[in-house]
Amino acid sequence: MPELFTIPLALAGISHHAADIATLEAFRFPDEAAFLHEARERFRGVLLLQTCNRIEVLVQGDARSLEGFLQEKGRHGFTVIEGEAVPRHLLELAAGIDSLIVGEDQILGQLKQALAAAEEAGTCCSAIGLCIKKAVHAGVRVRRQTQINRGAVSVGSAAVTLAENLLGTLRDRHILVVGSGEMGVLVAQALAARGLTAIYVANRTYERAVMLADKIGGRAVNFKDLYRYIALSDVVISCTAAPHPVIRTEDIRAVMEERLWPLDTHPRHLILIDIAQPRDVEEGVRSIEGVHLFTIDDLRNVNDATMESRRSEADRARGIIDEEAEHFVRLLRRAAADETLALLYTWAESIRARERDRALARLRERDDRTAEVIDDLTHALTNKILSDVTTAIRACAECGDITTAEALMRAITRGEPCFQNEE
């Protein structure tokens, strides 16, 4: 018998647990739409999740095929999980337990965006849609029933905390935020929540910079004036979605010359915090005197400082995940059973139609009414015969008793080639 009652799921990727920012950057797929289009030829369903600290590929397919596909794409050093380990991982991910900043809320939106991209690309099968929606639902429940997202709960807010730790206080400091997308909004909000007033927002689209600056009581900066404002700033937090660096080494070298007063021997220190993926700031700025560059890798220490207070909340979250995981697996088993039972009903319908036509052919005299009655009768008999057994098959599949479910299928379909067991 072909493999039934199972939806093969596999997930592969890398994350902050085992990869630094350079490794993540190298693994990233710059053209997500092209990747999904190519993967669609190999798998029934594909979803690509790319965040600041993880790149993961979820497919309806087997782990070996996924591993081979990624290796063909020049990606190595990733981990692969399959089967019922996949839904549990997605639950932990959505709950924020697996995040760099434990409890962060942004992962929920990122999962939704990845799902929307897969739907737009035509790579979202029903199983993947079910997985992501269920994971997001569970993530919302964890945050509602625990305080796991208390404190610095985003990469953006953690970047602000890092700047605060480095300087002692951000009061009377000039802070420049480069980028006004989702991460830029989080950074700006975290700054505004501290009552800071010297906040500047730069964005390639000036109107978006104005909108964000107005919301937080800051000042919008035209992107052509970026380096002039970097020269005036104490801290620059950069988080654009540009595919290439926007803050270059030679330009920062010139900026630092402007920060050197005639009687000073050293320029004023400049803190650059790059939380973009791919990177916004060229690595070469580290060689410039007075420049201090920090990246997502440096945010781990900020997270470690808050972990102790969240440990009990994480334990509570795992309890919720245990409950959700059991229900999640049952849903996937039921979905797999429904796919198999759809095949069963298709098979039964072909037999019903064949026998109906044979019966009608044997009647010497028949009219439309007779044909309608016989058609209704055969429909009713088929559904009645299958009703109880399909309920039993579905129940067995849901609780993981695949052996019994397959035995029931054999009992019904033995002798028919579409379900014949190949021994």
UniProtKB/Swiss-Prot annotation:
GO biological process: protoporphyrinogen IX biosynthetic process from glutamate
Family matches, as Gene3D superfamilies: Glutamyl-tRNA reductase, N-terminal domain, NAD(P)-binding Rossmann-like Domain
Function: Catalyzes the NADPH-dependent reduction of glutamyl-tRNA(Glu) to glutamate 1-semialdehyde (GSA).
Family under the similarity heading: Belongs to the glutamyl-tRNA reductase family.
Entries under SUPFAM superfamilies matching the protein: Glutamyl tRNA-reductase catalytic, N-terminal domain, Glutamyl tRNA-reductase dimerization domain, NAD(P)-binding Rossmann-fold domains
Its EC number(s): 1.2.1.70
Record-listed NADP(+) binding positions: 179-184
Species per Swiss-Prot/TrEMBL record: Methanoculleus marisnigri (strain ATCC 35101 / DSM 1498 / JR1)
Active-site feature positions: 52
Name the UniProt record assigns to this protein: Glutamyl-tRNA reductase
Keywords: NADP, Oxidoreductase, Porphyrin biosynthesis
Site (Important for activity): 89
This protein's encoding gene: hemA
A Pfam family that the UniProt record links to this protein: GlutR_N
